[in-house]
Amino acid sequence: MHPDHHIIRAHKVSSCCNAGLLRPASRRIQRTQKAQGAKTKMSTASHYVCDLNGMDWQVAQDFEANFRWEYDDGRESLLKLYRKGKRQQWDSDTRIDWSQDLDPENPAGMPDEMIAIYGSPVWNRLDEKGRTRIRHHVQAWQISQFLHGEQGALVCTAKIVQQVPGIDAKFYAATQVMDEARHVEAFSRLLHEKYELVYPINPYLKSLIEDTLRDSRWDMTYLGMQVLIEGVALAAFGLIRDYARNPLSKSVTAYVMQDEARHVAFGRLALRDYYPQLTDKERDEREEFVVEGCYLLRDRFLADEVWECLGLPVAECKEWVDHSELMRVYRTSLFSRIVPTIRDIGLWGPRIRKAYADMGILGFAEGDVEGMGLRDEVVARELDVRLAEIKSTAEQAAATA
């Protein structure tokens, strides 16, 4: 392999895809831009693995915007979270070192065991080049879903600002809108500049976002986005943060998680106060939504579109994924944050418990959500310290060379 082959990309062929290495000319341009401190300009459309039916998606909504004329009225728990959100704003251009490259053999440096078809006959038949393509595409697919989900969170949180009746919740939701914009920016840049490959939104994730946005009740936006989508995203981010060997991948997810832990706490605080006021019928409707949403999120991680894009036998891959013990453990672990949150906000009727038992995730009910959120903050701060030490050491070495 040529020593300059340190960045990977995919070349689109018709409606499918074919992963290769970044051309030398493109590498020289990118290095010049890095030296000048400029971002690479590119169109997302040119990086999608398949043609889309347009670059826009409109979701019709019918809801009322709430104004409140009492401005000195707020729950201390939410106001405290709001102040924390203001203090912890950050700039992805300066906090993240974008000069770092990805490994062409394994961009994020993730264990192969986390690939859904690892150990399958399909995987075992592949040569190293084929496995490299799968690593690239699976990771790009996952980050693409993070990206689309973060845009969903951006839109949903803007809706919460309008809908939620309390001024304290409006204050915090406004800080989250900024957070989500930053997350979209960071994941978009990671895909554009480093992977140069983007997958469309998974249909299951798209369906849940659409259901969340179409519902006119303000609490359903919280429930669908703050609790379900952000909850499973936190668990997925955590796997990359904790297992990735690439420092760029680790830092992006660690810093996003620091914000997301606050977002889930926001949903918990708002809904925990509101749900005791619901009638049995209203609570049943929420529980049905949660059950359906959790099944959609579970099925989101099948990644059928990746196997199809790469020309692999989709039916054989699906059969393996459906019966893989490794994938069962992986998929259930993604609900480690959702289950205790659902219990905490008071949606813990027989329907929820049965569904969670059937999915094999009921055991997460005793999880310490607050403790997990605190750990997310600690990990992000520790990463800042380590990266600062590495940068200082490198600068000292350069000065004495």
Give the role of each language-model region.
Residues 144-147, 151, 174-177, 181, ...:
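Short amphipathic alpha-helical segments with heptad-repeat character
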